[in-house]
């Protein structure tokens, strides 16, 4: 569930989300290692936190590429409060870092954070910044400060053990009107700095309590929405993906007796029979003008 709204005469906006089930679904769909669960989980939470601020029909993609062993993590959200995502190396594991925590920064390494905002126009808006920590939350805050000139704070956490995802969530606070009094800015910064980690915070407090601790007072009107893991892949799109292959590749699949397309976003497998591949090959013949 995501909670969102504004404070201080709409000069500050916030979102806070708990999405353990969503991250657990991602873990199961992609058969993720512990570390990969934390990395993708953090990215999905980051993408979820911006959903209340998206334009209608907007698709927002967080794409992080680094020189670490996970190589790439991609999370996408929509204005309908859905998320989906994947990592390039779902089985990555590393020793715990010096703080005894999952080494997310080590898994990602040095690299770039790219945001793609697709508003349904001809060309999506793409912006890129260098990674400042590889921990994802700080990188998102840096992106908003540099690319969108919005002072932001993000805090994101995923707790996972042998039984699965225990806690997954985070919050984002953004100053969208620079006329906000300096003492309020300093108060928010101080309160956020004094909060424990998300994993600990969500064990001891409910989202509305966390917001009260951030802003120093009870929040007024708060909207809510359910975050869901949802992919828009289907069999027809999978078939079109096969049609992109050259004729020889399709013929090789037909000889093997079947063809398979796996969606990178949700790991759904679409299997096509020898007969279906025969039909697709006819399209290839027709395309060639024969």
UniProtKB/Swiss-Prot annotation:
Coiled coil: none annotated. It is found in: Cytoplasm. Its main location: cytoplasm. InterPro entries: Heat_shock_Hsp33 (IPR000397), Heat_shock_Hsp33_C (IPR016154), Heat_shock_Hsp33_N (IPR016153). It holds the Pfam family HSP33. The keyword Cytoplasm applies. GO terms for biological process: protein refolding. Under oxidizing conditions two disulfide bonds are formed involving the reactive cysteines. Under reducing conditions zinc is bound to the reactive cysteines and the protein is inactive. Disulfide bonds join 231-233, 263-266. GO terms for cellular component: cytoplasm. Keywords: Chaperone, Cytoplasm, Disulfide bond, Redox-active center, Zinc. GO terms for molecular function: protein folding chaperone; unfolded protein binding. Belongs to the HSP33 family. Redox regulated molecular chaperone. Protects both thermally unfolding and oxidatively damaged proteins from irreversible aggregation. Plays an important role in the bacterial defense system toward oxidative stress. This is 33 kDa chaperonin. It comes from Thermotoga maritima (strain ATCC 43589 / DSM 3109 / JCM 10099 / NBRC 100826 / MSB8).
